[in-house]
Curated annotation (Swiss-Prot):
PROSITE patterns: SOD_MN. NCBIfam families: Superox_dis_Halo. It is an enzyme of class 1 (oxidoreductase). This is Superoxide dismutase [Mn] 1. Its EC number is 1.15.1.1. It comes from Halobacterium salinarum (strain ATCC 700922 / JCM 11081 / NRC-1). Belongs to the iron/manganese superoxide dismutase family. Its cofactor is Mn(2+). It catalyses: 2 superoxide + 2 H(+) = H2O2 + O2. GO terms for cellular component: cytoplasm. It holds the Pfam family Sod_Fe_C.
Length: 200
């Protein structure tokens, strides 16, 4: 069984300052994200051992750990890729056109996304819904509650308190504003184009 590994940040730890501090990125990436990677690997090891021994007393817990930690790892990886020190612009091209078509305007999309970010106890996600071939915003609690089956994350914003409390205290709204100062649409645009090509 291959092990999951923590990918390096695609920029330096201080690259998103003053919007997200070096300290927060260090803690968030090296401790929190690493913890989800470790948890996923541990859960997979438990499942493999249980399949070999036939003793499934710990299987239910391990299955839950796969979902929680695996989703945490995947979403954190998308979160890092959704930002860059050169970010802060609005989307362009095919993704901008689809946002305008599905939400009415970029401003409408952003307002709805910010509402998801204020409501979620986990993540605000822009996803591609392969059932309706549309973009949707979803508010996800933890890492895996509230997700839509058949949807593909395009843009990820982590709104767990560990993402912002050190920098912004309880003012989550200021953190969401800061995210838009560093949001980078290159990777999300590529993910959207791949999903649209596959399902449309």
């Amino acid at each position: 069984m291959s092990e999951y590994e923590l990918p390096p940040l695609p920029y330096d730890y201080d690259a998103l300052e003053p919007h997200i501090s070096e300290q927060v990125l260090t803690w968030h990436h090296d401790t929190h994200h690493q913890g989800y990677v470790n948890g996923w690997n541990d859960a997979e090891e438990t499942l493999a051992e249980n399949r070999e021994t036939g003793d499934h007393a710990s299987t239910a817990g391990a299955l839950g750990d796969v979902t929680h930690n695996g989703s945490g790892h995947i979403l954190h990886t998308l979160f890092w890729q959704s930002m860059s020190p050169a970010g802060g612009d609005e989307p362009s091209g095919a993704l901008a056109d689809r946002i305008a078509a599905d939400f009415g305007s970029y401003e409408n999309w952003r307002a709805e996304f910010e509402a998801a970010a204020s409501a979620a106890s986990g993540w605000a996600l822009l996803v591609y819904d392969s059932h309706s071939n549309t973009l949707r915003n979803v508010a996800v609690d933890n890492h895996d509650e509230g997700a839509l089956w058949g949807s593909h994350p395009i843009l990820a914003l982590d709104v767990w308190e560990h993402s912002y409390y050190y920098d912004y205290g309880p003012d989550r709204g200021s953190f969401v504003d800061a995210f838009f100062e560093v949001v980078d649409w290159d990777e999300p645009t590529e993910r959207f184009e791949q999903a649209a090509e596959r399902f449309e």
